[in-house]
Amino acid sequence: MIKNLSEQTASFGLCPPRCYYVPFGGAQKEGAREDSERFVSLNGTWKFRAHEKLADIGEDFCSEVLPDEIPVPSCVQYFGYDSFQYTNVTYPFPYDPPFVPVKNPAFHYSRNFEADGQGRLYIVFEGVDSCFYIYVNGKFVGFSEISHRLAEFDITSFVRPGENRLDVVVQKWCAGSYLEDQDKWRFTGIFRDVYLLKRPEGHIVDYKIEPRLLEDGSAELLFFHRGGGEA
């Protein structure tokens, strides 16, 4: 059974925040991110199963053969797995922060991916509503509940050379939903891109470019970075 982390923390296992970029190989010319040899899209058709609540997901869910399919990115409501819901000034569930209803729909996604076992491997979710749990080869990697935040996980220690299994469980509501009471339709699922980033062991993680105007009227451009090695 998956332990509900939503009432305890906003995230677990996430990489520290960084500026947004997709790395390219040293010999590559920069371009669209899909052209990078270090970018692997996981968009497409995933295996899928809908549950009425998190507790309905069994102990061996990471080895389960899921009966349905769903495109990623998308929202589950468009495929009949949950009802469309619109609210503006009222909450879409009983107000009792940080708690949400026990009968809180949960959606299990799964797919396989290949890894070469070289360097470091990261997985990036650009948007999941509302919270989600990620497992690689049956092992818990992490959790995030800020729907529109990019969530990046280092999965190097969880993968093996060859085929690997990825399982993601998404809940409709979480504690973070109390901060998202906006005038909008309520949609659920992996609604933005998912991809892998392949990096060498030593690499730039984060950077900052800072322009400065000097007293003599000239300017300088400073480059700060975290991490090192091949960019």
Regions found by a protein language model. Name each.
Residues 1-12, 28, 32-33, 47-51, ...:
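Accessory beta-strand-rich segments of carbohydrate-active enzymes
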Residues 1-88, 169, 196:
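Accessory carbohydrate-binding/adhesion or oligomerization-edge regions at the termini
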Residues 41-44, 128, 228-230:
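A short, compositionally biased
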Residues 84-99:
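Surface-exposed, low-complexity/disordered Ser/Thr/Gly/Pro/Asn-rich loops and linkers
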Residues 121, 134-136, 217-231:
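Beta-strand-rich binding/interaction modules
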Residues 211-217:
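Short, solvent-exposed loop/linker segments at the N-terminal edge
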